[in-house]
Amino acid sequence: MRVVLLILSSLLLITAGYGQSTNWTYPGNSYSDGSGTGGLDSWEGDYTYLTEGGSVYECFDYSNGSAGTWYTPILKTYSYGFSLPTGAEITGIECQIKKTGFGAATWYDYEVKLYVGGVQVGDNKAITSTPYSGEVTDTYGGPSDLWGLTPTKTQIEASNFGVGIKCKAVAVEYDYNVVIDFIRLKIYYSVPSGSSPFFGVPF
């Protein structure tokens, strides 16, 4: 019986390190990065607005724009405050963004990219061909998607790690706006197994 229990304990230690993830996590800071076009000068709001069910971030033009294709600045979010176990190896990054387009324009994603070390890098996960039809929540990345990167635990935990979105408006006249209700991230990771307490060898 004792041997069986030791073997079971070893198996639990082996499997415990796989398929783990953080909870959905909201940013601790944000700002409007760069400049937009067509009167879409900046994002208005605060990072505290980017939690589910709260206020919304907004980028708008009510008088200065015109018919054409225009772009918002990047809404950059960071300071997610992740804390991963010692030895964690990142296996995937998932992002969800809830957004709505309004007014005399059809709205699309233009760019959804990560910030690592404060620099925008990796794959562009924007869903560029599908317009925002009412209020939508889109998912980018996933449990085995690293966005073309090899991020480390240290990079994920850094305050300058985050994600940004840039939107595109195909406008027929002035008076159009887009709002972001929330942006959140989830990190998937594994922890390499240590030594077996029963066999005394690495596994």
Regions found by a protein language model. Name each.
Residues 105-119:
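Short, surface-exposed beta-strand/strand-loop-strand elements in extracellular ectodomains
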Residues 67-86:
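Short beta-strands within extracellular/lumenal beta-sheet-rich domains
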Residues 2-34, 38-39, 181-203:
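Enriched but not universal
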Residues 100-103, 119, 167-170, 191-192:
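Acidic glycine-/aspartate-rich tracts in secreted/extracellular proteins
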Residues 61, 78-79, 93-95, 124-176:
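Cysteine-clustered segments with highest specificity for TGF-beta superfamily mature ligands
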Residues 98, 113-117, 188-190:
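Predominantly extracellular/luminal cell-surface or secreted proteins
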Residues 86-104, 161:
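A short beta-strand element within beta-rich, extracytoplasmic domains
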Residues 20-68:
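Activation corresponds to long, low-complexity, non-globular regions
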